[in-house]
Amino acid sequence: YTALTGRPALPPKWSFGLWLTTSFTTNYDEATVNSFIDGFEQRHIPLSVFHFDCFWMKGFEWCNFTWDKDMFPDPAGMLERFHKRGLKICVWINPYIAQKSPLFGEAMEKGYLLMKDNGRVWQWDMWQAGMGLVDFTNPDACSWYQSKLKALLDVGVDCFKTDFGERVPT
């Protein structure tokens, strides 16, 4: 099959190393993350990637693609410090924009959210109240979403954990 369709690219070597995550830690900052990483170094356990789960953003504003300034006042500097420690950085994202997110109004106004048959924005409360789903069938919505990812890459994020793609409405 792949002889006809093409061989997949080999992921970068660092992606096969050990990943550490905040997972369900809900109240963390750079000092907390450093304590996690320091614990691994003290035990001589090599890490390749540190993954920031959802609370790198303000709680219940997922996804706003913006570091929580109260917990991470200098994201670019922090990521540079982690890179100097030899780590790659991953952040959690999903295809939903919370009603509480500053991006919700923008996405709704520009028609970037999935719509119901009645012309209203499709919203769901499964993960957080009033989530809208980015309409990835809209090329402008895709470009808008990609611009949010590019901004994160530009500040030093190396990869993304793309979550909740399985919950697309039918």
Locate each region found by the language model:
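Carbohydrate-recognition beta-sandwich/jelly-roll modules
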Residues: 1-48, 76-81, 88-89, 93
